[in-house]
């Protein structure tokens, strides 16, 4: 338990509090005394200066220290700021002498009556015993404070030691952490170095492989460039020839211009010839239309065998096939009439465009880039504003069917389908050209009107039927490129052929050529139904051929059809059906041509109404 010492006087007198723990310096004391003096002067008429006194015990004591409480200091802060100059004057007086002086204080005689009472003193007078007790208490407090200060110093020293120890430990921990981080950094650096070495090795190998591939591609590109350069030179040579022909024609035209009379005569003759030709063509078209109408009417009124008698010749064909043939031939005639009118009204020579189309068709080969390139070339010709589209379509259909140097029929069929996707009227005109060139593409047969066929005629028949078979089996389903005369039309043709067409060398050649190119696609689509048709060919069509009296010219074709059926060649994809790859194509055509083996996944449909 501690001893609490309290002075034998009130803790606060006139706003002045006694501080149990004095810690003032001399300047603070002087300022406080000046403040007290100012307050006391307010109650005394004649303020008395404070002087030094001796202790009652007959000895001089230490300086008396007064302390104002914090509450009083806060209340007096405003007053101290107002009397700052006055406090400085009092401080100088107290420092120079040993008493307080108020030299600047003005006292008037009129204010003497206001303060008649006796002066008051700051402290009550103490007795001897009380003074001694106060001294003892003060000494005891001083000793206790010294002990407390010593203990606080010891505690502070121990705390500082603990802090230093903690700081040292923290420094060691941080140093250890830095050491571990450095070790981990070195390990990570070593690992990254190993990864970089492995990656560099891998990249070197990949780069070497890519370099080898690039060398191979460069050699391939150089080879293709050489071929393209040769083709370019050939095209340049052809263009030069065309240019020379045009120059020659222009020279002739200039010669005609010089002779105006001759030119007028030529124009009059040409006009007469054109008019006569138009009249003749119109008459021929009307006559042909009348003949076809008569044929259709005779077919419509025929019996189940569909035999029509016309001038002693019997036409054997299905009624639906004849209607389609007539419809297509009519479109072709209308197109030819339109083209003739365009040629007569225009001074432009369109033969160069027709020759260009024929040259492009002859250059078609069984490669993807060739097919794509020729399609682009033909489309450019069709879109050339110098030549009407109808003339280009007619030339394309005629050249495609009648070209003797027949290229790959499968490649030509792809070209036909894609051109028809751009210009839908092409297919009917092309089929009409097929029907004009070979009646077995209808299929149709005229009995007792067949003249002696030579080898060239059979070759043309074989070429046309192979192209027709390749066309019907071509199945392309990308964007707008759809075969409108697809495999179902081939199935209908085969049914009509076996039902209506008799067996002879020409019909056998047509059937064999058709099966060679379309048999694989028909089997892929119709499976067991196609096998039934194969049995019909074997048991009926071939038997009729063998039953002929003179079979010397039929032995070869019978052997070919028999080998095709017995060896089941319809299970093997025909040669040339799959396009070869020679370069990289970046078009919609390439995506379709890259289909594996071009095996069309046909859906089963019933086409019984075609029989």
From Swiss-Prot:
Its main location: nucleus. InterPro entries: GLE1 (IPR012476), GLE1-like_sf (IPR038506). It is found in: Nucleus envelope; Nucleus, Nuclear pore complex. GO terms for biological process: poly(A)+ mRNA export from nucleus; protein transport; seed development. Disruption phenotype: Lethal when homozygous. The keyword Mitochondrion does not apply. Residues 71-89 have a biased composition (Acidic residues). Signal peptide: none annotated. Gene3D superfamilies: GLE1-like. Residues 69-94, 220-243 are annotated as: Disordered. One of its GO terms (cellular component) is nuclear pore. The keyword Iron-sulfur does not apply. Keywords: mRNA transport, Nuclear pore complex, Nucleus, Protein transport, Translocation, Transport. Part of the nuclear pore complex (NPC). The NPC has an eight-fold symmetrical structure comprising a central transport channel and two rings, the cytoplasmic and nuclear rings, to which eight filaments are attached. The cytoplasmic filaments have loose ends, while the nuclear filaments are joined in a distal ring, forming a nuclear basket. NPCs are highly dynamic in configuration and composition, and can be devided in 3 subcomplexes, the NUP62 subcomplex, the NUP107-160 subcomplex and the NUP93 subcomplex, containing approximately 30 different nucleoporin proteins. Required for seed viability. Belongs to the GLE1 family. This is mRNA export factor GLE1. It comes from Arabidopsis thaliana (Mouse-ear cress).
